[in-house]
Curated annotation (Swiss-Prot):
Domain (Fe2OG dioxygenase) ranges: 151-270
Gene name as annotated: P4H13
Gene Ontology annotations of biological process type: root hair cell development
Binding site for Fe cation: 169, 171, 251
GO CC aspect terms: endoplasmic reticulum membrane
Main subcellular localisation: endoplasmic reticulum
EC number, as in UniProt: 1.14.11.2
Reaction(s) catalysed by this chain's protein: L-prolyl-[collagen] + 2-oxoglutarate + O2 = trans-4-hydroxy-L-prolyl-[collagen] + succinate + CO2
Effect of loss of the gene: Reduced root hair length and content of hydroxyproline in root cell walls.
Name of this protein: Prolyl 4-hydroxylase 13
InterPro entries referenced in this protein's UniProt entry, alphabetically: Oxoglu/Fe-dep_dioxygenase_dom (IPR005123), P4HA-like (IPR045054), Pro_4_hyd_alph (IPR006620), Pro_4_hyd_alph_FE2OG_OXY (IPR044862)
Keyword tags: Dioxygenase, Endoplasmic reticulum, Glycoprotein, Iron, Membrane, Metal-binding, Oxidoreductase, Signal-anchor, Transmembrane, Transmembrane helix
GO molecular function: iron ion binding; L-ascorbic acid binding; procollagen-proline 4-dioxygenase activity
Amino acid sequence: MRSYGKEKKLVFPYVFIACCFFLAIFGFCFFNLFSQGISFSEIPTTRRSVNDETDSLDHGSSVSNIPFHGLSWNPRVFYLPNFATKQQCEAVIDMAKPKLKPSTLALRKGETAETTQNYRSLHQHTDEDESGVLAAIEEKIALATRFPKDYYESFNILRYQLGQKYDSHYDAFHSAEYGPLISQRVVTFLLFLSSVEEGGETMFPFENGRNMNGRYDYEKCVGLKVKPRQGDAIFFYNLFPNGTIDQTSLHGSCPVIKGEKWVATKWIRDQTYD
């Protein structure tokens, strides 16, 4: 005859040991997050928008700790609060102001330089910045994205004044529009150099497949919106891992209603870029 009482006595210690084991694992994970300076509010989450109410974190230029939020998986967008210091942002603006020129955008078939000169921007190589600020920012971008720096284009520093916007577009190149491609833009990294009092959001109208019914007005400011806040950054993927363009990566800049918007963009290619 089997003794069920003895089996119950034997089962209890194993259950207790298993519980202790899982509690130990949880405790280790919690301690690991805590030791890296990551709070539960900073664990990647999906958000419909980001604005001034985002929890404020201490600014810092350290590259050892880069907190982030996952804003969306379609497209893959990540938000990095306080990525650069106020001093770094203002130094980049001061450097760029006297050098701004009409933007020279990549031209599609049928476009001319005259039709795209609505913005003023500056392409700046890190080795042309004697202060070392851009080099420090680029080093942090490399740690955040895990892409080698020889895949990077030069910084594109762009200023939006009152009423200026950037209609929805792709940073990746469609070969049908631009012709044969030598390389492709995999990632766009965008650093907000200034806060904007009203308007100026970076928006993704096709987030999670919304507005993709063929009737979307490319001048409308809809979808996932990220309000510019000085020192914060976002980066997003323009391509899927198989190299095809992510159609939901369509993005633009809403009109500036009050204030001025400064951004520094770093495009990252899929191979070494000169």
